[in-house]
């Protein structure tokens, strides 16, 4: 029956997810071990030593990010974390998040266009929302080809604020879009082959407990556009 099919599908996704995460953990560990062994053997130039050290640091950061996302998502789903909502300026946060990734988009010669209003106040957990926008901007950079374009736009819409992150990357088909926010989903497009299926699941969960929402429009080869909606605070005189 339908329930059995759904349980079977979930179990399959879970098994695929565990296998994928195991691979994701092994990959940076293998890199770190290989480059650390080369450094220990010696005989490298200063430039090579710096390059190897930077590679180890990048692999370590990738592993740390993945483990952090697993722990955060687990705590959110088990309701061990509740939002600590307080008023803050979303526009400033978006600027800060974008600048955090500036070196990455410049390295790929990406045209990063930020269209932000001067100031908009929201009542939310600032640290949690930082996870949302860092994930979306990071993904856009990751999946946008060199010389491509990314648009970060924020506008007020009635009692809401709408944030859009659009890219000119590989895009997704309908099947992938339907399940891109599922925790265990590993789609067939390059949007889901890179990474471990955690970032967007974490983004959606954070927004759900914050009274917000996220949606996506996309097509293969035409890029993707993620739209976040959050309730905004009334403007004061």
Segments and roles (model prediction):
Residues 140-141:
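Short helix-loop "hinge" at the ATP-lid/N-box region of the Bergerat-fold HATPase_c
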Residues 147-159:
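Short beta-strand/loop element within the Bergerat-fold HATPase_c
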Residues 172-184, 204:
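Short conserved segment of the HATPase_c
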